[in-house]
Curated annotation (Swiss-Prot):
TM segment ranges: 169-191, 301-323, 343-365, 392-411
Superkingdom to which the source organism belongs: Bacteria
Keywords for the protein's UniProt record, in alphabetical order: Cell membrane, Hydrolase, Membrane, Metal-binding, Metalloprotease, Protease, Transmembrane, Transmembrane helix, Zinc
NCBIfam families: RIP metalloprotease RseP (TIGR00054)
Species of origin: Streptococcus pyogenes serotype M3 (strain ATCC BAA-595 / MGAS315)
Annotated protein name in UniProt: Putative zinc metalloprotease SpyM3_1689
Residues the entry annotates as binding Zn(2+): H18, H22
E.C. number: 3.4.24.-
SS bond partners: none
Length: 419
């Protein structure tokens, strides 16, 4: 149960942070956001705000999306002769067009629609008491569709394709950007929770409770200067010295550890503990505990994580295998394991997954943010927009590829995790 809760929390935070990036910058760029969705498939919960944005929580944990005006099949069709009820504002502009038999306004004006333009001229024409009349439509007017769904109209100036190239570019990049920011923030938080960043340049150590060094009398912040005569000036020197000193170590044998404690030099016999095929003496690198050190430590962890992911991506390109990929099932399995190991493991996993999600979404494949950014760049270079039909076909092809890949990865994950 703890694993499921951890998975839901991690998944929810990653998706919300990612999609909020798209949502926020779309709004800032003047684009009308139709829907902010967490998950895919059937709706579990929905809410419409005053700005006309629908917020939905959906059943399948396969990502999320921000649907913007002008994307796909976004046009509202009103057939000639359709009965409608118009609600006017104080200026005489239509603020609501009701095509349903519900949500009726007693002050509304009945009309049989004969023509309309809700994108450019913002007008609606029809028969009112057998007389043809035309009314101006307010820029933020809403339409109540036949099924009772109320949505805002989308004039050309609030549609995605008519936003500035810079606005579209930052809107597409903002999702991955938010994931990078989240990853960095969580790594910094992790370093603060751990008390600092390991100082691998120092020979000062932290002593593990009930470990070999603790039993021999070493304490936190003691300075190991030699092991079996091998000089130690850093953590790397220490690990190498332990390996050399234990290379031919027999059962019950000890090694000599020379250390400095309170300015006094001491030498003790330490019996290393064997874990798998290696020996340890029960110490960890000391911590850099300054505020700046912790901030830089978090950034260092984020950079190291990104570098690891990029290397994995390179390996995927040179030698593709489904076993190198993971979907929601693999994410659940990792969340379950992290939950058993405590908060620090959960935060570390969340940070790595967030950076992973950011990098993955920047791959220039249609349907991913990277593919949209690539088309934005091509448009900027050509200085003319790509045809909507062309962009739609490219995106559809990308979606098809991603769906097939997701099904294959999920099936592979199920077989690997549960069987």
């Amino acid at each position: 149960m703890l694993g499921i809760i951890t998975f839901i929390i991690i998944f929810g935070i990653l998706v919300i942070v990612h999609e909020f990036g798209h949502f926020y910058f779309a709004k800032k760029s003047g684009i009308l956001v139709r829907e902010f969705a967490i998950g895919m498939g059937p709706k579990i919960f929905s809410h419409v705000d005053q700005g006309g944005t629908l917020y939905t929580l959906r059943m399948l944990p396969l990502g999320g999306y921000v649907r913007m005006a002008g994307w796909g099949d976004d046009k509202t069709e009103i057939k000639t002769g359709t009965p409608a009820s118009l609600t006017l504002n104080e200026q005489g502009f239509v603020k609501r067009i009701n095509l349903s038999q519900s949500k009726l306004d007693p002050t509304s004006l009945p009309m049989h629609v004969t023509g309309y333009d809700l994108e450019d001229q913002l007008s609606i024409t029809g028969l009112v008491l057998e007389e043809t009349k035309t009314y101006k439509v307010a820029h933020d007017a809403t339409i109540v569709e036949e099924d009772g769904t109320e949505i805002r109209i989308a004039p050309l100036d609030v549609q995605y394709q008519n936003a500035s190239i810079g606005g579209r570019l930052i809107t597409n990049f903002a999702g991955p950007m938010n994931n990078f920011i989240l990853g960095i923030v969580v790594f910094i938080l992790l370093v603060f929770l751990q008390g600092g960043m390991p100082d691998f340049s120092s020979n000062h150590v932290r002593v593990q409770e009930n470990g070999a060094a603790a039993k021999a009398g070493l304490r936190d912040n003691d300075q190991i200067v030699a092991i079996n005569g091998y000089k130690v000036n850093s953590w790397n020197d220490l690990t190498e010295a332990v390996n050399l000193a234990t290379r031919d170590l027999g059962p019950s044998q000890t090694i000599k550890v020379t250390y400095k404690s309170h300015q006094r030099l001491k030498t003790v016999a330490v019996k290393p503990q064997k874990h798998a095929k290696t020996y340890t003496i029960g110490v960890k690198a000391s911590l850099k505990t300054g505020f700046k050190d912790k901030l830089l430590g978090g950034l260092e962890l984020a950079w190291s994580g990104a570098f690891t992911i990029l290397n994995a991506l390179k390996g995927l390109i040179t030698g593709f295998s489904l076993n190198k990929l993971g979907g929601p099932v693999a994410m659940y399995d990792m969340s379950n394991q992290a939950a058993q190991n405590g908060l620090e493991s959960v935060l570390s996993l969340m940070a790595m997954l967030s950076i992973n999600l950011g990098i993955f979404n920047l791959i220039p494949i249609p349907a991913l943010d990277g593919g949209k950014i690539l088309m934005n760049i091509i448009e900027a270079i050509r200085r003319k927009p790509i045809k909507q039909e062309t962009e739609a076909y490219i995106t559809l092809a990308g979606v098809a590829i991603m769906v097939v890949l997701m099904i294959a990865v999920t099936w592979n994950d199920i077989m690997r995790v549960f069987f």
